[in-house]
Amino acid sequence: MLEFVRPLQSILQIKQVNSTDLVWRLHCRVTVFLLLLASLLLSARQYFGNPIDCVIGSGTVSSSTMNEFCWIMGTYISNDPNFVLDSTDLVKINAKIGHIPESERSYQKYYQWVVFILALQACMFSVPNFLWKAWEAGRLQSLCDGLTTPIVPDHWEKTRKKQLITYLSADFPRLHRTYLLRYCFCTLLNFCNVLLNIFLVNVIFSGFWSNYHPAVKALLSFDFPSWNRYNSQVFPKIAKCDFHFVGPSGSKQNRDGLCLLPLNVVNEKIFAFIWLWFLGLLVISMLNLLFWIVVLCSKGFRLWLLTAPLYPIRTSYVARALDGQGVGQWFLLYQLCRNLNPIVGRELVQSVSKAKGHNGHKTFRMPKGGEPDFYTDPEGYDEEGV
C-alpha cells in the first residue's frame, strides 16, 4: 500500500519558503493528493480483484465474455428504491425483479470512468498552482534565500541587507501590482475550480449533490442501514446486465446476468468524502475571496496584517515603509514577512522606513527585458524627491 503513496509524497512536502497561503495549499496540494490517491487506489486490482464479476446460468456465453461485455456496455438497476433493498438478497432478486423495462432502468455508465474522472479533477486543481509557479518564477525564494531559519544567519551582513533594502525602497508600481494581480487571479481560479468540479460531478452522476445528500446525512448520524440503502442508489454493489446475441438459427437471444461491482464499495466512501470536502472547500474559498476583497479595499487592514507578525515594531515604522507605495509593494512586504526570520523582517522594515524618511521617494526606471538585477547593480535606481 505504501508503494502507492510514495510517488505522491512530494505534493505534500513542506517548503521553507511559501508564496501561497493555507487555503491555496488546501486546493493545490491536499486536494490534488487525495484525488490522485483515490485514483491510484481504484486502479489497483490486486486489492479489489476484477472490477466486475457477472453470474449467468449455463449456456453458450462464457463468464469472461459476459464480464467484458458488461464492463464495456454498463450495468443497470431499477429506479424503484425497493430494488436496492432487495438486492442484498439473491433469492428476493430472483423472486421479485424479473425483467426491468427500459424506461425504469438506471445505468451505471460512470463505473469504468471513475479512475479517470478523479485524475482529471486532480489535474484541474493543479492548474492554478502551475500558473502561479510560472509567473512567480522563484522571486520570493531568491529574496528569502538563507534568511528563513530560526537563528539569524552569519551572512546577514551589510552587503546582503543593502541589496534587500535597496530593492524594497525602490518604487516598482507596475511590477509589484502585476505580482499581486496574478496572485489574486489564481486565488479566484481556485474558487472557480471548486464550482466547476461540483458541476462536473453533478453531471456525471446525474444529480449527485441532491441524490447523495441522504446517504451522507445518514453516515454522519451513524445510521448505517440508511447509509447502505441510500448510497446503493448511486453506487450499487449488485446490478443487472443484458447480453444480446444471435442464436444458431438466426433468432435474437438474450442472456441476463447478475453483476457484482466491487469498486463501488470504495467509490461510495470516496464520494461521500468528496461531497463533504468540496462543499467545505467552497465555503472556505468564498471566505478567502472576501478576505482578499477587504485587503484590496482597506488600507488600515493591510497595515494591521503587515504589523502583526513584526511585533513589537511600531505601526509608524510600517506605515512609513509603505508611504507612497501601492498595494503591490504591501503584498511583497507581506509575503517576505510571512517567510523571513522575524528579526530579519523587523530589521528590513525599520531600515526601509528610515531609508524612506531620509531619501524620499525612489522611482526605478524599468529596463527593457524585465526586472532589475539588484544583486549586480544595487544602485540601479534614480532618486526623485517628492
UniProtKB/Swiss-Prot annotation:
Residues 1-21, 133-187, 294-386 are cytoplasmic. It is found in: Cell membrane; Cell junction, Gap junction. Its main location: membrane. Structural component of gap junctions. Required for normal development of ovary. Required for normal egg production after blood meal. Required for normal development of testis. (Microbial infection) Modulates the development of Plasmodium falciparum oocysts. This is Innexin inx4. GO terms for molecular function: gap junction channel activity. Disruption phenotype: RNAi-mediated knockdown results in a severe impairment of ovary development. Impairment of testis development. Absence of sperm cells in male gonads. No significant effects on functionality of male accessory gland. The gene is ZPG. Residues 358-386 are annotated as: Disordered. GO terms for biological process: monoatomic ion transmembrane transport; phototransduction. Belongs to the pannexin family. The chain crosses the membrane at residues 22-42, 112-132, 188-208, 273-293. Residues 374-386 have a biased composition (Acidic residues). PROSITE patterns: PANNEXIN. Residues 43-111, 209-272 are extracellular. PANTHER family: INNEXIN, INNEXIN INX4-RELATED. It comes from the Eukaryota. It comes from Anopheles gambiae. Keywords: Cell junction, Cell membrane, Gap junction, Ion channel, Ion transport, Membrane, Transmembrane, Transmembrane helix, Transport. GO terms for cellular component: gap junction; plasma membrane. InterPro entries: Innexin. It is a multi-pass membrane protein.
